[in-house]
A protein has these predicted regions:
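Sequence-pattern detector for short linear motifs
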Residues: 7-8, 143
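Cell-envelope and extracellular/periplasmic
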Residues: 21-227
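Cleavable N-terminal signal peptides
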Residues: 8-9, 18
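Bacterial N-terminal signal peptides that target proteins for export
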Residues: 1-7
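Short glycine-/acidic-enriched loop or helix-start segments at secondary-structure transitions
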Residues: 10-12, 118-119
Length: 227
């Protein structure tokens, strides 16, 4: 590669690096639900040593962190009783604003094929259920892609770009068990409900167990790689 081409590539790449905003995992998006009355962990990446601020509109508080040598940072924000919509703004000098954020009850919908079964084409009277789903806009849905890892991950791959507002279209490929559970919760509690689907048909229960926990069980101590 000649000097002229090298200089051209540097000139193209450096502005991108200098203008890069703080980044968040795909689970933090517009339309998300955060657990009420909790200290909720929010994390992401920024340029090492960069100061990061997280501002929550429900109380106007700002939480500060500094990106580590590897670029990681995290804060814990205090959430109020259920309500919204709110905004969460994350900035290292260039703000990223998450809009239409609700505070409520958040549930993980996990398991095998019985949890994986979707609403569309699988549920009795599913067409009517999909028509009625638009009335439940305070139910929000997050669908996690299937991924394997021997250690907990800081980031996850999600479908549909992140959190979705409940609608007929959006519940179509969401867990039927999870959706009807969330719908009943909403009817009984009357507050925002966040549903996170992370399920995989045919998986063993041990596959959902941490390596540390399996290491405490003699039978699995030497079999962790196969579960």
């Amino acid at each position: 590669m000649n000097l002229k081409r090298t200089l051209f590539l540097l000139a193209a790449v450096l502005p991108l690096q200098l203008s890069a905003k703080v980044t968040l995992p795909a689970i933090f998006t517009d339309n998300m639900v955060l657990q009420q009355q909790s200290d909720v962990k929010i994390w992401g990446r920024a340029k090492p040593g960069k100061a990061v601020k997280v501002t929550t509109s429900w109380d106007g508080k700002t939480y500060a962190a500094t990106a580590s040598a590897s670029g990681g940072w995290e804060v814990r924000v205090s959430t109020p009783v259920a309500g919204g919509p709110y905004t969460v703004t994350v900035s290292d000098g260039k703000p990223v604003e998450l809009k239409n954020v609700l505070i409520g009850e958040v549930w993980l919908c996990s398991g095998q094929s019985n949890m994986e079964m979707r609403v569309a084409d699988r549920v009795l009277n599913y067409e009517q259920e999909m028509k009625e789903a638009d009335a439940y806009g305070n139910i929000r849905l997050l669908h996690i892609d299937n991924t394997t890892s021997p250690v907990p991950l800081d980031e996850a791959s999600v479908r549909h770009g992140g959190w979705q507002v409940c609608s007929g279209e959006n519940i179509a490929d969401f867990s039927a068990t999870g959706y009807f559970f969330g719908k009943e919760l909403y009817k009984n509690l009357g507050i925002p409900i966040g549903l996170i689907e992370s399920c995989w048909g045919g998986t063993y229960a041990e596959s959902w167990t941490s390596t540390e926990a399996l290491s405490e069980m003699p039978y699995f101590r030497d079999r962790k790689s196969v579960v």
